[in-house]
Design a protein with these regions (language model features):
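Ser/Thr- (and often Asn-) enriched beta-sheet segments in non-cytosolic proteins
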Residues: 29, 95-97, 115-117
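A short, hydrophobic beta-strand-centered structural micro-motif
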Residues: 58-106
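Solvent-exposed, acidic/flexible segments
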Residues: 42-50, 89-96, 122-129
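C-terminal/domain-edge helix-coil "capping" segments
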Residues: 109-146
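Positively charged n-region of N-terminal signal peptides that target proteins for export
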Residues: 1-6
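Bacterial N-terminal signal peptides
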Residues: 8-17
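A structural "domain/chain start" motif
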Residues: 17-54, 145-146
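Structured segments of extracytoplasmic/periplasmic soluble domains
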Residues: 52-63, 135, 139-143
């Protein structure tokens, strides 16, 4: 009887020790937050950015949920924008920085961040911005480490 009780006690302790480890690995979810308005991006471009961010989170094997403990949010800034004249049509060029932050909601601590430069071209600034957002590759090695 004494052996059975100690055996059950050891099994119970092992279950308590193993379960939190597996639930932490499987239960991670990150919410994606994109501002409703931006100085640089219009509503359609913000939707495109949100889709890219959700793809980045999903590509990492983490679920993208709106009610998550962690949030991923972007800071998008245009560093340089120019219009190259010549030929039959002018070409707009945009060099921008996209910084992604993962923040813990309960204490606002930044857990991780990554910054990358994106470039785009088009017949106007709007098309160049869309091209810059399209150049973000969710499955790239930069995001695998992020």
């Amino acid at each position: 009887m004494k052996v059975k009780v100690s055996f059950l006690f050891i099994i119970t302790l092992l279950q308590l020790w193993i379960n939190p480890i597996t639930s932490q690995a499987e239960g991670v979810s990150i919410g994606v937050i994109v501002p409703e308005e931006s100085e640089y991006l219009n509503h359609s471009q913000l939707n495109r950015l949100q889709t890219k961010l959700e793809q980045i989170v999903s590509a990492g094997g983490i679920s993208a949920m709106s009610n998550a403990y962690f949030v991923l949010y972007p800071v998008f800034e245009i560093n340089e924008s120019s219009l190259v004249e010549g030929g039959m049509k002018n070409i707009a060029m945009v060099n921008a920085s996209l910084t992604l932050f993962i923040r813990q909601l309960d204490n606002s601590m930044i857990v991780n961040s990554i910054s990358l430069d994106v470039k785009g071209t088009g017949f106007n600034k709007g098309e160049a911005l869309v091209n810059a957002l399209t150049s973000i590759k969710p499955y790239s090695n930069e995001f695998k480490q992020f």
